[in-house]
């Protein structure tokens, strides 16, 4: 299945609502590059994860959906040895230049928006080299983004995917499969030092209008669209306005979770005699046993399709974690070394050298338990989707699963906080069936399950919260912070004739 191409805005639920934005993008492009004509637009959306957070990098399936906020790149090509990138928000994202005559490098100490573009450029150039296309074209690009940065809706993934798509199409890749675009962009943010899984990129690429996604990582990466059985169901996404920059806080938040889960995987593998078992490899981002790999080694390989088998295996692992990782509240490095038979030097070299992290103790029990319990909730949601139930029962059951997820994100994964919990409580008291932090957490956004009938009461209560919590906030800022969203179209290309129509 290829990334689709459009000659209009029909991929939006309300095309007319986006026309002025594209007109502004064209106007800004012409002001930056007066001698150029836009050849095409490359676009990729943000995403909201409905259930299944901090489990994708352990290769357990997740249930996100693409949303209509997105990143759009207006592109022209030339024969210069440089790429110039600009933005409609030039005050926040000033014009930058990337030389094609030099090796692409990312200075992690110098944090700039061009680094994200370079992530897309690097993976695109590697893909082009695989196709024996080594000479890159110069490009002039202007970006427009509506995904809030640091809002937990994958603005960075949307930007990296749109950048990758722009570079590929500009260099003659007229037809790229969704599978290839996902495969190469999954690792794009690794160049910034973020050890993410593949959920964000896959959701951005595979999104379909009106459908959420079941994303699997084993035995292969794929996204399967599905529809909800309740027609009046809708999701409200609230930006907490607590900016969560995954890269700046990675050593104490996101990357620390990756490391804790990696160590938990190795310790479980050792204690459960999975270590060295035939067919079970060290497949995590940090070359350890993943928690999915441990489950497959201990319970038997799961094909990712038979939900009943997956449920049995996960329930078994939840029981095993409680009996095996016995130090609730955290392990010291010394305790880890003792249980794993390693010296402190060996432990540091194996687990703490590749990814810089900061901690007092390593909460292996809590993190592993979260992964297995959250993964079980994903499968129970899928089972619910395949069961004939009335609308009320579906909403109540799915809402309960979302609320259980929020509890574990707060208590076991510690990626929520009191203010996020307060927003969830307000929503649940005013028409939401389920509310949970979505994405990396530590700020960002919350997703609420509700119905069209309950929508006015829910949004009114959330608007009141913002006015109380943020005196002076404008109505426009509230509208941007509280959005109801249906599932949206994923990555796509929009052709040149449309830009002419906009200028007319």
From Swiss-Prot:
Pfam families: GalKase_gal_bdg, GHMP_kinases_C, GHMP_kinases_N. Alpha-D-galactose binds at residues 47, 53-54, 56, 196, 200, 254. It catalyses: alpha-D-galactose + ATP = alpha-D-galactose 1-phosphate + ADP + H(+). One of its GO terms (biological process) is galactose metabolic process. Pathway: Carbohydrate metabolism; galactose metabolism. It is an enzyme of class 2 (transferase). Keywords: ATP-binding, Carbohydrate metabolism, Galactose metabolism, Kinase, Nucleotide-binding, Transferase. The keyword Metal-binding does not apply. ATP binds at residues 150, 152, 154-155, 244-246. GO terms for cellular component: cytosol. InterPro entries: Galactokinase, Galactokinase_CS, GalKase_N, GHMP_kinase_C_dom, GHMP_kinase_C_sf, GHMP_kinase_N_dom, GHMP_knse_ATP-bd_CS, Mevalonate/galactokinase. The record marks 47 as: Transition state stabilizer. The keyword ATP-binding applies. Its EC number is 2.7.1.6. It comes from the Eukaryota. One of its GO terms (molecular function) is galactokinase activity. The active site is at 200 (proton acceptor). Belongs to the GHMP kinase family. GalK subfamily. PANTHER family: GALACTOKINASE-RELATED, MEVALONATE KINASE/GALACTOKINASE. Galactokinase is a key enzyme in the galactose metabolism where it catalyzes the conversion of alpha-D-galactose to galactose 1-phosphate. Can also induce the transcription of the gal genes in response to the organism being challenged with galactose as the sole source of carbon. This is Galactokinase. It comes from Candida parapsilosis.
């Amino acid at each position: 299945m290829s990334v689709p191409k459009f000659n209009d805005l029909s991929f939006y639920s309300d095309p007319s609502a986006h026309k002025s934005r594209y007109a502004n993008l064209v106007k800004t492009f012409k002001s930056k590059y007066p001698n150029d004509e836009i050849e095409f637009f490359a676009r990729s959306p943000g995403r909201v994860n409905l259930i299944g957070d901090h489990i994708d990098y352990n290769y357990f399936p997740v249930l996100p959906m693409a949303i209509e906020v997105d990143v759009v790149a207006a592109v022209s090509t030339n024969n210069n040895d440089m790429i110039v990138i600009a933005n409609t928000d030039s005050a926040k994202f000033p014009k930058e230049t990337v030389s094609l005559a030099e090796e692409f490098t990312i200075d992690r100490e110098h944090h700039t928006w061009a680094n994200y573009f370079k992530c897309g450029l690097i993976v695109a150039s590697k893909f082009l080299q695989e196709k024996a296309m080594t000479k890159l074209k110069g490009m002039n690009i202007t970006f427009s983004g509506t995904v809030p940065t640091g809002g937990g809706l994958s603005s960075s993934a949307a930007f990296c995917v749109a950048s990758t798509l722009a570079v590929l199409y500009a260099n003659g890749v007229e037809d790229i499969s969704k599978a290839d675009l996902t495969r190469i962009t999954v690792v794009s943010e690794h160049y910034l030092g973020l050890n993410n899984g593949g959920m964000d990129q896959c959701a951005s690429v595979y999104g379909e209008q009106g459908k959420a996604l079941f994303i699997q990582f084993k035995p292969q990466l794929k996204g399967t669209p599905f529809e909800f059985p309740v027609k009046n169901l809708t999701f409200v996404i609230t930006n907490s306005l607590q900016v969560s920059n995954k890269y700046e806080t990675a050593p104490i938040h996101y990357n620390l979770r990756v490391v804790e889960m990696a160590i938990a995987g190795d310790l479980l593998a050792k204690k459960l005699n999975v270590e060295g078992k035939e067919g079970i490899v060290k497949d995590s981002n940090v070359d350890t046993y993943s928690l999915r790999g441990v489950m497959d080694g201990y319970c038997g390989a799961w094909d990712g399709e038979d939900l009943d088998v997956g449920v049995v295996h996960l329930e078994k692992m939840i029981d095993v974690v409680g009996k095996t990782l016995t130090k609730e509240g955290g392990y010291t490095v010394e305790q880890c070394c003792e249980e794993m038979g390693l010296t402190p030097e060996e432990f540091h070299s194996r687990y703490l050298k590749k990814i810089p992290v900061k901690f007092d103790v390593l909460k292996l029990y809590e993190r592993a338990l979260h992964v297995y319990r959250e993964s079980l909730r994903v499968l129970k949601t899928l089972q619910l989707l395949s069961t004939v139930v009335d609308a009320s029962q579906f909403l109540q059951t799915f809402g309960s699963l979302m609320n259980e997820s929020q509890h574990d994100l707060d208590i076991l994964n510690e990626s929520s906080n009191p203010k996020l919990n307060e927003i969830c409580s307000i929503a649940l008291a005013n028409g939401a069936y389920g509310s949970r932090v979505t994405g990396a957490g530590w700020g960002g956004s919350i997703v609420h399950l509700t119905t069209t009938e309950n929508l006015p009461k829910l949004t009114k209560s959330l608007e009141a919260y913002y006015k109380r919590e943020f005196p002076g906030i404008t109505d426009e800022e509230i509208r941007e912070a509280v959005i109801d969203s249906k599932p949206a179209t994923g990555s796509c290309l929009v052709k040149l004739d449309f830009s002419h129509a906009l200028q007319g």
